[in-house]
Amino acid sequence: MINIALPKGRLVNKVYTLFEKIGYENKELLEDNRKLVFENKDKNVRYLIVKPSDVGIYVEKGVADIGIVGKDILLENNHDVYELLDLKFGKCRVCMASVNGYKEDIERRLRVATKYVNISKNYFNSINRDVEIIKLNGSIELAPILNLSDVIVDIVETGSTLRENNLTVIKEIIDYISARLIVNKVSYKFKNDLIKTIIKNIEEVL
């Protein structure tokens, strides 16, 4: 049995379709239900539907053999897994943004609101900028509007959410983020042939 962790939310159908194309289908997964575990014994596959930020943990701890996760989450959490394939969808960037017309005072500590604490720290350390990191878990765009922060660090796809809230990108911190296929290190050793076959088949349909 191969256990595959899929990210709950907007990408789950796209990711599942990828596995369906290579013969690991489970039609029940696309039905309107609240189940989080889907098993197809004929195909020897079990899908686990988990929060995107938790996919890496499930794979690192061996609960899942394979997972699909955004590169941003891998950079933020530094999970001890093998990153084996860029799936080339779910593309976005990690950017610093603020309200339109914002002018930075370089003499003052910069207040940064973000859910990407480690990515932000690494970036600002690299440019020797003194910052206060304010960790938020959602509605990051509100922070500079309400003066909770000077800037935000967040993922940007089209930029429409920023524009709708009168925010603009100041700096592109990471220019390419996409969905990645990750593998548990022990699984890669003991299920190597199966995992390599899955990767080869995925590469052929990308």
UniProtKB/Swiss-Prot annotation:
GO terms for molecular function: ATP binding; ATP phosphoribosyltransferase activity. It is an enzyme of class 2 (transferase). It catalyses: 1-(5-phospho-beta-D-ribosyl)-ATP + diphosphate = 5-phospho-alpha-D-ribose 1-diphosphate + ATP. Pathway: Amino-acid biosynthesis; L-histidine biosynthesis; L-histidine from 5-phospho-alpha-D-ribose 1-diphosphate: step 1/9. Its EC number is 2.4.2.17. The keyword Amino-acid biosynthesis applies. Keywords: Amino-acid biosynthesis, ATP-binding, Cytoplasm, Glycosyltransferase, Histidine biosynthesis, Nucleotide-binding, Transferase. Signal peptide: none annotated. It is found in: Cytoplasm. GO terms for biological process: L-histidine biosynthetic process. CDD domains: PBP2_HisGs. Pfam families: HisG. GO terms for cellular component: cytoplasm. Catalyzes the condensation of ATP and 5-phosphoribose 1-diphosphate to form N'-(5'-phosphoribosyl)-ATP (PR-ATP). Has a crucial role in the pathway because the rate of histidine biosynthesis seems to be controlled primarily by regulation of HisG enzymatic activity. PANTHER family: ATP PHOSPHORIBOSYLTRANSFERASE, ATP PHOSPHORIBOSYLTRANSFERASE ATP-PRTASE. Lacks the C-terminal regulatory region which is replaced by HisZ. NCBIfam families: hisG (TIGR00070). Belongs to the ATP phosphoribosyltransferase family. Short subfamily. Heteromultimer composed of HisG and HisZ subunits. This is ATP phosphoribosyltransferase.
